Amino acid sequence: MEKPNYQLYRNTTLGQALQKTLDDFVGDQMIPDSLSKKIMDSFDKSINKILPHKAKNKVNFRADKLRAYRYCDNVWTFIVEQIDLRDAVEGGTVDRLKIVACDGQTKGQIGHA
């Protein structure tokens, strides 16, 4: 059985734009709802597959306070406050940040070198 893909990236600008476009197509009866769902599933699979290889930007951060954390279904969620963010070009501060970290290994890879 194939591992389900995280739907985390549907909340990105790209994911939201794709969803809105598909909703418009379904609303105009240009495509059926079932095709829209298949396209979003394909987006989930593709983005989860390609990002580990193509995304190379790194951001450093320092938070003054860890407000909450949770680990459920191989997903860590952290809520931190008073954060100083820095990358190679610029930096800034934010009052509150939610960090979601998903397990990057498939079930068969865990524990294997």
Curated annotation (Swiss-Prot):
KW Manganese (keyword) present: no
Database matches in CDD domains: TFIIA_gamma_C, TFIIA_gamma_N
Gene3D superfamilies linked to this entry: Transcription factor IIA (TFIIA), beta-barrel domain, Transcription factor IIA gamma subunit, alpha-helical domain
GO cellular component term, pick one: transcription factor TFIIA complex
Keyword Transcription carried by entry: yes
Subcellular location, record wording: Nucleus
This protein's UniProt keywords: Nucleus, Transcription, Transcription regulation
Transmembrane segments: none
GO molecular function ontology, one term from the record: TBP-class protein binding
One GO biological process term: RNA polymerase II preinitiation complex assembly
Homology family: Belongs to the TFIIA subunit 2 family.
Database matches in PANTHER family: TRANSCRIPTION INITIATION FACTOR IIA SUBUNIT 2
Subunit note: TFIIA is a heterodimer of the large unprocessed subunit 1 and a small subunit gamma. It was originally believed to be a heterotrimer of an alpha, a beta and a gamma subunit.
Protein name: Transcription initiation factor IIA subunit 2
Organism, scientific name: Caenorhabditis elegans
